[in-house]
């Protein structure tokens, strides 16, 4: 099964990079508390690189978690066999990442400090990694103690919503450190509401 193969690959990658992943965790958690920690993280070449590696390592586990607990469960996936459904989820996530990248490139402005803009955009790497770790921990613990799968799903969705809200706040704070309140709001709408809204719409409407 595709799920088992990808899970094994993910496990091997995590084991190979375990020291790097453990070492970056304190910096990632600090970014949840203060927006300036994201600036400090990006100012360090090593920490920035390790954060990027962490985000890459979390890509497959995130998709597997979404698949396993049906966090993204639009009606058009009903009746699909496991492998095609997992492939569809990976495809949707890849499209989401691609759309974010295009928007981040297209909305770059000379009026904003390039380093600040880069830090704001890369904050998604930090919060994505933290979210994935929390989802894995939640799924593992609640499954082990026998919690109903639907309750696990709801808990994960609440965690996802809270982390995303915190991410929005921190990203906005980074933006307004280099531009006006209104400009920061417009950047946030363009870079976050469009791609995230598209994913939500694909799950609710279709």
Residue positions per predicted region:
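Hydrophobic alpha-helical transmembrane segments of multi-pass integral membrane proteins
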Residues: 52-69, 94-95, 99, 129-138, ...
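Alpha-helical transmembrane segments
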Residues: 1-16, 82-96, 150-160
């Amino acid at each position: 099964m595709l799920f088992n193969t990808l899970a094994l690959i993910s496990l091997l990658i995590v084991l190979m990079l375990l020291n790097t992943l453990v070492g970056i965790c304190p910096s990632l958690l600090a970014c949840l508390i203060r927006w300036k920690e994201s600036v400090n993280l990006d100012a360090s070449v090593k920490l920035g690189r390790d954060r990027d590696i962490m985000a890459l390592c979390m890509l497959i586990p995130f998709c597997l978690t979404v698949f396993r607990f049906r966090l993204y469960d639009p009606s058009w996936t009903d009746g699909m066999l496991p492998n095609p459904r997992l492939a569809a989820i990976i495809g949707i996530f890849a499209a989401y990442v691609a759309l974010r990248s295009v928007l981040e490139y297209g909305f770059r402005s000379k009026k904003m400090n390039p380093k600040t803009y880069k830090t704001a955009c890369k904050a998604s790497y930090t919060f994505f990694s933290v979210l994935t770790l929390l989802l894995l921990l939640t799924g593992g613990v609640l499954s082990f103690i026998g919690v109903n799968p639907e309750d696990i799903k709801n808990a994960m969705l609440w965690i996802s919503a809270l982390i995303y809200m915190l991410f929005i706040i921190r990203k906005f704070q980074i933006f307004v450190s280099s531009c006006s309140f209104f400009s920061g709001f417009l950047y946030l709408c363009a870079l976050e509401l469009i791609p995230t809204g598209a994913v939500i719409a694909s799950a609710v409407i279709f």
